[in-house]
A protein has these predicted regions:
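AAA+/SF3 P-loop NTPase mechanochemical coupling elements
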Residues: 145-150, 184-202
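Conserved AAA+/SF3 P-loop NTPase catalytic/coupling segment centered on the Walker-B
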Residues: 153-176, 208-215
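Conserved nucleotide-binding/hydrolysis micro-motifs of P-loop NTPases
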Residues: 161-162, 204-208, 224-229
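Conserved catalytic/switch belt of AAA+ P-loop NTPases
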Residues: 169-191
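Conserved glycine-centered beta->alpha loop in an early N-terminal alpha/beta scaffold
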Residues: 1-63, 67
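Phosphate-sensing "switch" segment of ASCE/P-loop ATPases
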Residues: 193-197, 211-281
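DNA transaction DNA-binding modules
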Residues: 112, 261-434
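P-loop NTPase catalytic core of nucleic-acid-dependent motor ATPases
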Residues: 38-156, 163, 168, 219, ...
Length: 434
């Protein structure tokens, strides 16, 4: 090895040099404070790849950020105080304590042009290019080569839709909570790196996240579309004012914000999150939810077929004993997706239905076994759902409250064309308007 202005130096001479620095491994821990760093980084055993945020607590300075706060409160959060406070606390946590992951994904679903990116871009300027990533290519996040995720504390995913991709959904759920990531860079040896990524998703699509009924990983907002679309004088002035906010002033606000009582896992339940759960329902869950909305169980009468060749559709009452075969046929017929699924078999249906009806030791589906019908004398396998009120309460507790609540029963008669009185028109001249 030849070094400039120096005599030839062999590798073994460099290895034997008393001031040569060596490490057991290189890893990532987002702090430069010796009091906060793990011992292996302080004593030099491991090399810390973290270089510090672009705007530190020392380089941040106070200034006017009211346009930004107003935007987050009234556009992002539609004036809701609870979600506004949570949003600011979530951001402050990423800035103040990046070594403590929120493990909660911030999701923004809206039309184009509402100003989602203006806020995340400011966060990116605070964190710097080493720790911030804004990505719209799915392969760079979930593909074979993922080195772009290395050393990141905030990853913003732009316009990434799941569209039923269970594989990507499973990978992403693991990424949110995993303690370590395998970094795979082209032409390099794979290595393990500790995870400190927080995630945000900005999208226009209806299905933004794979939010199952029991999901607690997502904080979902639907920003107002007040200023989106073609820009007029009002919206132009609004965004020009927002653009005057300086990242160093936002950094000062976030560094100084008190988050001592913030618990990231206590995510506000939003209507937008409920919408994502509805989008993510499995076919069996969807049919069960529709049955709870309608107030009866979908069944198929095994007694025959109508003139069109369709099986007789009957309704079963919640709380009543129903034949197992009739429930299977009725719910399958109620779901076009299940009807078209070549791999849909009874065993799969019952496994999914029992899973949908059971949570934390509670169940609303009861197997009564094979019993003889006292009137017909026929022995059949019967199941029973809990009463409707109990089933709806179970769904609210373990899934979500339906948008607008459950339908209310009423004694009022619905006026239909068949029941309306058209006698006044029957004797009128059909060529003249009544």
């Amino acid at each position: 090895m030849t070094m400039a202005n120096q005599s030839d130096m062999k590798v073994h001479d460099w290895l034997a040099h008393p001031t040569r620095r060596s490490y057991h491994e290189a890893n990532f821990y987002p702090s430069l404070d010796p009091a906060q760093l793990p011992k292996r980084f302080v004593d030099g055993t491991d090399m810390n790849l973290f270089q510090g945020y672009a705007i530190t607590k020392q380089t941040a300075s106070p200034g006017n950020i009211e346009p930004l706060l107003d935007h987050i409160k009234n556009i992002w959060c539609n004036g809701d105080a609870v979600t506004y406070e949570y949003t600011l606390n979530w951001m402050a946590r990423v800035v103040q304590k990046p070594w403590q992951r929120t493990r909660i994904v911030l999701v923004l679903i809206s039309k184009e042009g509402v100003g989602k990116g203006m806020v995340t871009d400011i966060l990116g300027e605070i964190l710097g290019s080493q720790c911030f990533l804004s990505e719209s290519r799915k392969d760079n996040l979930f593909g074979q080569f993922n080195s772009s995720l290395s050393c990141k504390t905030l990853v913003v995913m732009n316009e990434l839709l799941w569209a039923g991709s269970h594989e990507a959904s499973g990978v992403f759920k693991d990424m949110i909570t995993d303690k370590a990531i395998t970094v795979n860079e082209k032409h390099q040896v794979q290595r393990q790196e500790d995870c400190y990524q927080n995630y945000a998703i900005c999208t226009q699509g209806p299905w933004a996240v794979p939010a199952s009924c029991e999901s607690r990983r997502f904080f979902v907002l639907e920003p107002s579309d007040r200023y989106c679309g073609n820009q007029d004088q009002e919206s132009t002035q609004y965004f020009n004012r927002l653009a005057t906010v300086q990242p160093k002033h936002v950094a000062d606000f976030l560094y100084k914000r008190d988050i001592s009582s913030f618990i990231a896992s206590q995510v506000p339940e939003t209507k937008a999150l409920t919408g994502q759960k509805l989008e993510s329902l499995t076919p069996v869950q969807s049919v069960l939810y529709e049955a709870l909305i309608e107030g009866h169980v979908f069944c198929i009468d095994s007694g025959g077929w109508d003139k069109m060749g369709n099986p007789y559709q009957t309704t079963g009452h919640f709380g009543a004993s129903l034949q197992r075969s009739q429930i299977l046929e009725g719910m399958t017929q109620a779901s076009a997706q299940m009807r078209s699924d070549k791999h849909h078999v009874p065993q799969k249906f019952w496994r999914q239905l029992k899973s949908a009806c059971t949570a934390k030791g509670e169940t609303i589906l009861h197997d009564q076994g094979r019993v003889r019908n006292s009137s017909s004398g026929v022995r059949a396998h019967y199941m029973r759902f809990s009463p409707l009120d109990e089933c709806r309460a179970f769904w609210e507790k373990h899934c979500f409250v339906p948008p607008g609540g459950w339908p209310q029963e009423t004694d009022e008669n619905l006026v239909t064309p068949e029941s309306a009185n058209f006698d006044v028109f029957e004797s009128a001249d059909p060529t003249k308007s009544p």
